[in-house]
């Protein structure tokens, strides 16, 4: 609800009403943005609550991305994108069964194909919100590999956006350090 005060008789009542209405629309817009942010936070928090390793991984990847951005002298805008995308890169895993995230057993080809969809799901989630649309493409491409063996598009070399390559490197480094890699059943 908007509100304004008519502070003197010389002020037109309709101007006061117009200001109150404008304040109301601003409040609604800001509230909508807050709800959108809360939605993303709720999704990632749900994923992290169900799998604490994913939370640790997100934090580590974000930190590694920030460090690499500083070393590479990236702009403040690219650094923020990289940190945000680094933290949210696996948000698409929210649709996976928790046991697939545990990585302590061999998985079937069918399960592997389900896991490989997480960048697409993450892209769809982040592309739905104005405040994350600029990182959606990075999340989509974070599993691409320089030699073209990645997924979902099989991009290779410089077809992969630089920031997505940095996320892939940070993620791979963290996974190797934490020895959380799932083993695909051959």
What annotation goes with each model-predicted range?
Residues 1, 32-34, 131, 159:
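Catalytic core regions of nucleotide second-messenger enzymes
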Residues 39-186:
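Histidine- and acidic-residue-rich, metal-dependent catalytic cores
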């Amino acid at each position: 609800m908007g509100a304004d005060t008519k502070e003197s008789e010389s002020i037109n009542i309709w101007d006061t009403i117009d200001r109150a209405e404008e304040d109301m629309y601003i409040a609604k817009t800001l509230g909508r943005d807050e709800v959108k942010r809360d939605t993303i936070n709720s999704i990632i928090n749900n994923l992290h609550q169900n799998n604490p390793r994913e939370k640790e991984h997100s934090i580590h990847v974000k930190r590694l991305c920030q460090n690499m951005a500083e070393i590479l002298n990236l702009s403040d805008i690219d650094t923020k994108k990289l940190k945000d995308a680094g933290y949210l890169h696996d948000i698409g895993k929210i649709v996976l069964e928790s046991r697939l995230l545990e990585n302590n057993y061999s998985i079937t080809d069918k399960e592997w194909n389900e896991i490989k969809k997480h960048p697409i799901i993450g892209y769809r989630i982040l592309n739905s919100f104005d405040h994350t649309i600029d990182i959606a493409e990075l999340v989509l491409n974070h599993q691409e590999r320089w030699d073209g063996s990645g997924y979902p598009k099989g991009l290779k070399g410089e077809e992969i956006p630089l920031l997505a390559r940095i996320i892939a490197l940070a993620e791979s480094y963290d996974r190797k350090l934490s020895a959380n890699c799932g083993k695909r059943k051959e």
